[in-house]
Amino acid sequence: MRFSRLYAPTLREDPSDAEIPSQALLQRAGFIRKIAAGVYTYLPLARRTLLKIENIVREEMDKIGAQEILMPIIQPAELWQRSGRWDDYGPEMMKLKDRHNRDFTLGPTHEELVTELIRNELNSYKQLPVSLYQITTKFRDEIRPRFGVLRAREFIMKDAYSFHDSWESLDETYQLFKDAYSKIMERIGLRYSVIEAATGAIGGNESHEFVAFANTGESNVLYCDCGYAGSDERVPYKGDYEKDDEAEKTLEKVYTPNVRTVEQVAEFLNVPIRKIVKSLVFKGRDGFVMALVPGDRELNFEKLKAYLGDQSLQMAEAEEILEEFGVPIGFLGPVGADKVRIVADYGIKYMKNFVVGGMEKDYHYLNVNLDRDFKVNEWTDLVVVQIGDPCPVCGKPLKGEKGIELGHIFKLGTKYSDSMDVKYMDKDGKMKSFIMGCYGWGISRTLGAIVEQLHDDDGIIWPRSVAPYEVDIVVVGKEKEKEFSEKLYSYLLDKGVDVIIDDRNVSPGVKFKDADLIGFPIRITVGRKLKEGKVEIKERGKEAILVDANMEQILNAINEM
């Protein structure tokens, strides 16, 4: 490719809406352009990198025997209604009606469709196991699309699905995908971790995430020297609960004008934050639920959804709370809340004389005690585990790092085959539900994650495996330099090197800045050193070296880098 013909409009300033490095750099370097919130056009440089990412993923899928298909993006509502997820999936599902008033969705995932696909095709245990995958566009109506391609409404994803006649067979295939995903990370060149994760809206009973480390990541990875690693959405709390042994005090209802947050309540009443109980109200398919957690801990929404078995669960709106309870947010509490289902974290069992909302505007209860003042019948682990909490395996303090989820694999079991009544005949002639697994990888998200992990003040630092072009020939000089550069360009093309030549009529400074901004892994400068029989070769982010202006030696130097 000639830079003079390349469509890669670069920008000298960060876009005003860019929140993180990848969002800024991918736009500045001419990889993407924003069309609407969470919707992007991928320009030629981005397409080249995306195709290289896709090919790495495709090669690793093919190696483990997965077969590529392509399913439609638009899916009929009946499939999702049959599985029970039409209402459960939540507002992230983009729904639409056709001209005949039939309901459809722009697929956020394809479990229902692929299960329906094999209904009349896989009939016998002799045909199993089977793994199918696709690379396609998906849609999720994110409430706040942000961070560029890391959380977009429209994105490119690889999703795979496996069908089995036994859990042992699923375990084997699950491990194949787990190993393949690690190889994908390694081939791309990312620092990563494999962690235990929540199953979320997909369902199932076991899952793992593949997380690329990045300071701006939204995933919190907790890990231990013993080898344990997990998402903070999943890690169970195994710490000791601080037990209050003081005598019960008389319940008081205290006037607390305009005091709503835990911090405000603690300051106003002069009590430690740990002596406050947060009362959070959610709305799901079975109505309202009040969740109770100690004031010094955060509620783990994924744990609550998993406990309730309700992925449609959402935080109740202020208007809904006022209508249902007659109390504004900030003054809710369990005392007197007899008609709502209450689920509490284990830590509250050991608290005495604590503070809760007074179920009346501008009031809180002081010296509240369990059983005497209210009852809880449902107890579970509801808190977010933090850095320093005990490892659930060995008990040592957990460490933490932020990351970006790129891959997620699930053991689905019979969740979808049961709900959609899709069966096969086993070796005894009995009809049984397929045991399933599913395996997702964010292709376009990987584009952003690489930039988040690999960049500096000058621009992107692409690994050679996924760079849009591996080698950039920068022509600095007149006829002799141009003539040599053209010969070198043709030679490298013939040798299969992914090369671009910067033949633009612009200053050397502009060429060097664009090379660093775009992030070409290797830059060859053909300039004044050519008179001495040398060219300059520089790896991105490293010092330049001089190499003899000999085609074969230049190629050897490239291959050794």
Swiss-Prot record:
It is found in: Cytoplasm. Homodimer. Belongs to the class-II aminoacyl-tRNA synthetase family. ProS type 1 subfamily. One of its GO terms (biological process) is prolyl-tRNA aminoacylation. CDD domains: ProRS-INS (cd04334), ProRS_anticodon_short (cd00861), ProRS_core_prok (cd00779). One of its GO terms (molecular function) is proline-tRNA ligase activity. It is an enzyme of class 6 (ligase). It comes from the Bacteria. This is Proline--tRNA ligase. Consists of three domains: the N-terminal catalytic domain, the editing domain and the C-terminal anticodon-binding domain. The gene is proS. Keywords: Aminoacyl-tRNA synthetase, ATP-binding, Cytoplasm, Ligase, Nucleotide-binding, Protein biosynthesis. It catalyses: tRNA(Pro) + L-proline + ATP = L-prolyl-tRNA(Pro) + AMP + diphosphate. InterPro entries: aa-tRNA-synt_IIb (IPR002314), aa-tRNA-synth_II (IPR006195), aa-tRNA-synth_II/BPL/LPL (IPR045864), Anticodon-bd (IPR004154), Anticodon-bd_dom_sf (IPR036621), Pro-tRNA-ligase_IIa (IPR002316), Pro-tRNA-synth_IIa_bac-type (IPR004500), Pro-tRNA-Synthase_IIa_type1 (IPR023717).
